[in-house]
Amino acid sequence: MKRALISVSDKSGLVEFAKVLTELGYEILSTGGTAKALRDAGLTVTDVAAYTGSPEILDGRVKTLHPKIHGGLLGRRQDPRHVAEMASQGITPIELVAVNLYPFEATINKPGCSFEEAMENIDIGGPSMLRSAAKNHADVTVVVDPADYPQVVEALRSGGVPLSMRQDLARKVFQHTSRYDGIISGYLEAQSAGAAMKFPSHLFLQFEKVQTLRYGENPHQQGAFYRELSGREAAVARGRQLHGKEMSYNNFLDANAALEVVKEFGAAQPQGGAIAATSPPRGVTVAAAAIVKHNNPCGAAIGDTPRDAYMRARDTDPISAFGGVVAFNAKVDLPTAKELTATFLEVVVAPGFEEAALAELKRKKDLRVLDVGPLEADGRGGLDLLDMNLLGNRRAQSASTLRAPHTV
């Protein structure tokens, strides 16, 4: 009988996945809340404690750290010595592992999270099982992301998970555990240094590829766009493209520059026909718009409405604004959208679009429309990392939170 070891915090798709494994003849090994969820769904589950013959100890801190578990994951099926040693120790192979980790990052981001709560959400057994299974991916299928359940199910139903897929899944495991450890390390350093820490001794950054670009800054250069995984600040990198052609390298540069300008004015929201900034400098009520072309601002202004702000920004230099990128600190309404579609623009960036405004913008087939979400989530106060084309180096400085006084 084949065995699948399942222990997850994120239970998305869990029951459906386990049902397929059961139908395919797998014995399900599990612990704690995962085992309960599967039993509640009517599935047969073998507790890891019963399988290993060792009870959970230390308030559940030690559940799966056992030779019968890790031997079943690490033993090479094609090595006669491993097979014989496993048999002599009563260790049976485990063919599939589905594990995801305690939600450490979500825990430390909760308001009021205590140090003790954070420590209890550092997973030990999960990363150990993932790493053992991933190391021996020649024999074991390991799944850390519930989004991969469907492709694994399809492969199993088609005769087995191919080595190429197992290798790709193993790669995802090491990427996941690497980021997990980096977040823990960063948290502990911040805790030990306290408020005095501005620049950590080490920076652990991870990015995921959003898209491959047609070319880079120049046509002879290749390019790709990446998103930082741990960022929370409203940003072009975390925006959703609602319409238009694929974003280019220079579109991203210009959109980012324009958005950073309007973020200087805080997040504006409708309030009784005017615009009220949720974090405006000196209490001034403003809508803000900025126009950037070739990474250079060619117009920026404030006004009582997004339309007013845009018209003022455009009138700063109408010729340069043609074919530019426009960003707002307020939701785009229909009057603003009509002004935007009256000329040629590459990209419009905003923290939201009214339905009628979006329909108006979609009349321009190629116009890229980017929704970056609420600017209230602006998490400024961290570090700005500067790539100054110094090979092997990054410069860092505290984020600029200075707000210049202004009037409408």
Can you say where each PLM-predicted feature lies in the sequence?
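Short beta-strand segments
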Residues: 7, 74, 97-102, 123, ...
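N-terminal glycine-/serine-/threonine-rich phosphate-binding loop
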Residues: 1-51
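Glycine-rich nucleotide/cofactor/substrate-binding loop typically near the N-terminus or early
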Residues: 33-104
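Internal alpha/beta core interface subdomains
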Residues: 15, 20, 91-232, 238-239, ...
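ATP-dependent carboxylate/acyl-activation modules
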Residues: 1-4, 181-182, 190-270, 275, ...
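Short hydrophobic/aromatic-enriched beta-strand-loop microsegments
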Residues: 25-29, 43-55, 97, 141-142, ...
